Amino acid sequence: MIRVCICGGGSLAHVCAGVLSFQSEVEVNIFTRQPERWSQHIIVTDHEGKTYKGNLNVISNNPQEAMHDCNIIFLCLPGFAIESTLECIKPYIGNAVVGSIVCSTGFFFTAHRVLGNNARLFGFQRVPFIARTTEYGHAANLLGYKPQVSIAVENMEDKEEFRKIVESLWLTPTKLLHSHYEASLTNSNPILHTGRLYSMWKDWNGELYSHNILFYKEWTVEASKTLIAMDKEFMQLLDVLPVTPGAIPSLLEYYESHDAISLTEKIRSIVAFQDITSPMKEVDGGWIPDFESRYFTEDFPYGLKIIIDLAKENNIHTPNLNKVFEWGMSKCMKKSET
């Protein structure tokens, strides 16, 4: 029996809870600030109608209770919550492996600082599922699987055996990365999201939109040009870090494209992305950007910032990354000051 404690209550936490607890040899605990909102039973439905019905073992806001006898402690948390959560659970980790579904917001760097360099850690390079909560604590939709995921693993005697466990638990072909940099640094959310947001709203001056823009389906060539410029600088950073060539493909390579036009067509056509909207909020008369969305509060100060800081440390010139970062942070700072 494998016992997993999932920390968090977002969409990915819901889907992981359902998929893992559906498996007969897995027990799932939930560590959450809102245990009263969770049911002992969870249902996850994928895009083809397959359902994962699971029973949750322990649901608690008490870390000692939630972590008891767990083999794996798995964080499904926003970047700002990682350090405080690790500090909170540190006394109760015991021999468990600590992992994160997202590493691009600093999981490994923070875990090294809080738990020490000998902690047993793992983390995904990209999330294994596209997830949306439909009823908090009860149900979620699994909108898409990944054909393959990659994980970084540290301080484990048999990394291959652990890779097999992850592959089995998350129902996705899994390969091992060579260093935590390969999981921590990604051109997914920190560049894909931020570049798109910059292209959408860098010149926004208060006008109303008639609808919530579809983030991917209404993708623009301008957004693709911004991404390609940012990604080129990101690739220059990877060249000077202990990253295996090809471990983190360029965005053009990942999306099987060769220029801004083909990248735009590819992103617009991804079925699992079709209904994903932009971080906007409805007001009288229309829609406006929501600068308090996690797209801003997560991807700029925790995702893109890691890349910016490493580039500075390694003397990599990143004018496009800097431009987008400074714009995004100016929006975050304005909201934090109100």
Language-model region placement:
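NAD(P)+-binding Rossmann beta1-loop-alpha1 motif at the extreme N-terminus of oxidoreductases
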Residues: 1-53, 65-67
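Nucleotide donor/acceptor-binding cores
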Residues: 2, 96, 147-149
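Glycine-rich, highly charged phosphate/nucleotide-binding loops
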Residues: 50-65, 79-87
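Rossmann-like NAD(P)(H) cofactor-binding subdomain of soluble oxidoreductases
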Residues: 72-75, 79-140
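Internal, well-ordered alpha/beta segment that forms a basic, Gly-enriched binding/recognition surface
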Residues: 116-117, 125-172
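Active-site-lining helix/loop region of Rossmann-like oxidoreductase modules
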Residues: 150-253
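NAD(P)-dependent Rossmann-like dehydrogenase/reductase catalytic/cofactor-binding core
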Residues: 206, 210, 217, 224-338
